[in-house]
């Protein structure tokens, strides 16, 4: 019985008993299955990698964390009934029902689509009915020259979520097979934004190839979202750079399972912005739960020291975390530290590229 349905039932039973439970719950590294925010309790169901459970739970400041090995014991402890989940016997849907389900899953995973340019056939054919059922709605963003976008309503989201959960359960064996340490890193990178687009292709991961690859990257490519956990930020960077080809390949595999879609992006004014894959959160969660890849803390500390100063002259937020590596850069003559302020020399970017290439080589070498 898969963790996705289990946690839904447990969350429902907790709420029925008067406990405010949130499921899933976003943490620094991906998601956990359940949280009781008021009591600062984090809960994750063990289904694959214990290390993954432990690390995800520890990436958020919970007061108590619980890794659920026995669902019965957990439910007894919280005084709630154990979930009774029976395997659904589903008949093959008619062509019309399948088109509705495909369209719902498409909108659930993509979030929204530009109404003028819908190129997904099931959505094109069922959109009038989805609107009539109250499952989808059109809306515009800017007040000037508005363009219409389509997204799910609350009822549509609820119905679509069931379709996607069934797909994840249907392809559980395939997802477990895909769950390697390398795909864990890619999934964690994907967890920041649930999207990936083609930016680079790298065949070899020896230092010479990595150095050549990194030198070609523009400085903007090293911008890191400071709101992200350092491990998530590093994995997102890898997905956008050195592991991009492999990330796109994984997205293509997930799209064959109906758990990712290639979409055209448009601005609020309807201007075409390129293509990207959008990925079902549930698929990313499964890949992260079933596998694990450890990245040594020093790698994360050095990564932050090499990327954060490129967009911040005040390095106070990372000073205690990455101080040793910032001082190392200063000793190399590529920056100057004054209290929490940093001044970069013109050599810093090249220094960062070389050090990042060495870091990526170590990470990829460590993968089994």
UniProtKB/Swiss-Prot annotation:
Superkingdom of the organism of origin: Archaea
Name by which UniProt lists this protein: Uncharacterized protein AF_1739
